[in-house]
Amino acid sequence: IEASLKLFRKKGQPHLFDRLACELYPTYLRHAPFRVLLASRYGLLHTDPLTRGVTAVMESYTVTSGRRVTGERFSYWDRSSQCLYLAHGPGHLYRLDGDTVHEEVNGAGPVVFLPIEHDIAQPDIGPHGELAGALVDDLQYATETGSGILSAADQRLLFLSWILACGFGNRLPAKPLLLMEGDHASGKTLALQRVQAALTGRTLPMTIGSKDEEDFPTMLLHETPIAIVDNQDTPIEWLRDAIATYTTAGGWRKRVFYTRTESLWIKPQAFIGITTRNPATYRRPDIADRCLLIRLAHRSVQGSPERILANVLEKRPRLYGEWLWMLNRIVKLMRTTEVTENFPYRMVDFAQMVIFTARILGLDDSAAHTLLHAAQAERDELVLEDDPLLDLL
């Protein structure tokens, strides 16, 4: 075991790194991949007392001698080297330094990626000019928005900026909440599913109910980088508080199953996209102030969702490859641009992302600032929508 495994502490919890598969596992016997590893490679069955003794020694070693490591599920921005790391299947990752996209072995740098369930595609990296067309440009954006000044072009730039921000999970500790509002048959769910398919190779919208409060943090944790909350039309009181915690870079402390005293700090890095016809849940000022509103109109011509998603999956190597190329352009801007702290906007990190996105598209900074002002006006309008006192006045 010592020859093929390396023991770490990740957020205070014992983990082992498999040198052969380049994968990180928590050393809990209730964790199925860890049990499979012990049984298949070393003949240690989880019911054998010897196995429990071995895992106890592993956990003891990690507490006294284990090296601390950052463990992530999808992406990691390293502030010291100013490089972006992205998971790429079993044992591999991408390192983006602003010039080149390097494929490297998982665990060789400052981050170790946990196993993920995404489908792996070998990307065709380059400026193909297909990403925006496949995911952003063909949506039917509403021309009559709440504020009246958020144009279709603004919404396209806003949506693309959010898609690119999904690659910088820990770089944006306070994450914007994408709120996609539209009537039936406006394509709001499909719009988010296409993004999820392009980045992860699968689609998994979630429906949140009144009894899902305990599971919500874990659901977000596993749906990195994008969690789709679908058709959230009925206000749920606990969801307001959970969303407020999420948008302010908070987290949740949860007790480890089958223990009385062990706990884990859950801080999801997923970007949440919510589809709704009634955004009443998100009109609370501390939530609305961190929302990105995309308003879609009814589509007169409907296509087959299955065929549309299949087309995205077919093009995924080029779409994902262009996404990586655009992320690398942003990394270069991050490394060479002095970031100002005097933005007149909330969510300064995301505001900077909008400016970088505009630049790599060849737009002037004024286009980004116009969008950011319009987006703030739209958030202000969201708080006041359907306010009976305002109607009375």
Task: Please provide the spans of the model-predicted regions.
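A structural signal for short, well-ordered beta-strand segments and their strand-loop junctions
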Residues: 85-87, 179, 293
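Well-ordered alpha-helical segments embedded in enzymatic catalytic cores
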Residues: 158-162, 242, 322
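A short acidic (Asp/Glu
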Residues: 96-97, 188-191, 237-240, 285
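P-loop NTPase catalytic core of nucleic-acid-dependent motor ATPases
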Residues: 100-223, 354
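N-terminal nucleic-acid engagement/recognition segments and initiation subdomains in replication
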Residues: 1-126, 154, 219, 325, ...
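AAA+ P-loop NTPase catalytic core and its hallmark functional loops
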Residues: 241, 245-253
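Feature primarily recognizes SF3-like P-loop helicase cores of small DNA viruses
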Residues: 173-176, 202-241, 255-274, 279-393
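Catalytic micro-motifs at enzyme active sites that drive phosphoryl/nucleotidyl and oxygen chemistry
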Residues: 4, 70-76, 81-84, 163, ...
